[in-house]
From Swiss-Prot:
Belongs to the GTP cyclohydrolase IV family. This is GTP cyclohydrolase FolE2. It catalyses: GTP + H2O = 7,8-dihydroneopterin 3'-triphosphate + formate + H(+). The record marks 156 as: May be catalytically important. Its EC number is 3.5.4.16. One of its GO terms (biological process) is tetrahydrofolate biosynthetic process. InterPro entries: GTP_cyclohydrolase_FolE2, GTP_cyclohydrolase_FolE2/MptA. It is an enzyme of class 3 (hydrolase). The keyword Metal-binding does not apply.
């Protein structure tokens, strides 16, 4: 005899009649296909998905329903704002018996893409960008925020000035008493001594979050990453030869920046492009055992 399986989420009432903002699952592994320019490979994502539980008398939600919706989405859909909105709406509809009215999803993954070398033709390598998508659906409207971590090099302007001063002093000590200086002699001296003092630089990370416009047809992940890298001027490289390393050294010299400069450069590049944006930058100082950090945000009226 096959007896019905008990479902206490339906048959029992919670002992504490309290509404819950969100209930669901965290860290669900899922492969996703991105509907993005330049995204040629599926990503291994982690999903947090929840619905609200505003009726205090409902003991619990049906997590298996959420899991199956996500699994079907991953198998049959390409991830865009439109399809994500439809998934969230389906999550709410799957819990009509729980009186849920809102749903949210957080997706995290690494976006892997090829980046060309600065100078060497035909040379490129893979670069990974940690990405987070946060989507909330309520009353038929989608609110979607995307964020990405962009790694770059930062060279300290103060350290560069101090290094130049030391080089200047060394140059004067060597050539200061000469009424005429042979350019070739100077060039030879510079080859040996131009690194008499060098400014400190370090790998740095910018975490940039933007609100995706309601009418957007894609998340615009690569467009966001490209905008930030172009604003900074010194994104870390992948495959390099000596000519590329030299070009990178030039870029660092042309784009000296404090952590404040980096945050302002990025925010300026984002202005007017998104309904809202926030920037958090961190320089992993080579001079200190601690990091330098700055944050800024902007909202269109």
């Amino acid at each position: 005899m096959n007896s019905p399986l008990p479902d206490v989420a339906l048959t029992e009432v919670s002992s504490a009649l309290i509404a819950l903002d969100w209930v669901g699952m965290q860290g669900v592994e899922v492969p996703l296909t991105l509907g993005e320019q330049g995204a040629t490979h599926p990503v291994h994502a982690y999903a947090d998905l929840q619905v609200d539980l505003t009726d205090p008398s409902v003991k619990g939600i049906h997590m298996s329903r959420l899991y199956r919706l996500l699994d079907g989405f991953a198998e049959h859909q390409v991830l865009t704002p439109e399809t994500l909105s439809a998934l969230l709406e389906a999550m709410v509809e799957s819990h009509v018996d729980c009186h849920s009215s809102g749903a949210r999803i957080t997706l995290t993954f690494n976006l892997l893409c090829r980046r060309p070398a600065l100078v060497t033709e035909g040379l490129s390598g893979w670069k990974s960008y940690p990405v987070k998508l946060e989507a909330v659906w309520r009353a038929g409207r989608l609110c979607l925020d995307v964020s990405a971590d962009i790694t770059y090099s930062s060279t300290c302007p103060c350290s560069a000035a101090l290094s130049r001063q030391l080089l200047e002093e060394a140059f004067v000590a060597r050539f200061g008493r000469q009424s005429f200086v042979d350019p070739m002699q100077v060039a030879a001296w510079l080859r040996e001594n131009a690194s008499y003092a060098t400014p400190h630089s370090q790998r740095s990370v910018a975490t940039v979050q933007v609100r995706v416009a309601e009418q957007a047809t894609e998340m615009g992940l690569m467009a966001l990453i490209d905008t930030v890298e172009q604003a900074l001027g010194t994104p870390v490289q992948t495959a390099v030869k000596r000519a590329d390393e030299q070009a990178f050294a030039r870029l660092n010299g042309q784009n000296l920046m404090y952590v404040e400069d980096a945050a302002r450069k990025i925010q300026q590049a984002l202005e007017g492009r998104y309904p809202a944006s926030s920037v958090s930058v961190r320089h992993f100082e080579s001079l200190h055992p601690h990091d330098a950090a700055a944050q800024t945000s902007s909202y269109l009226s």
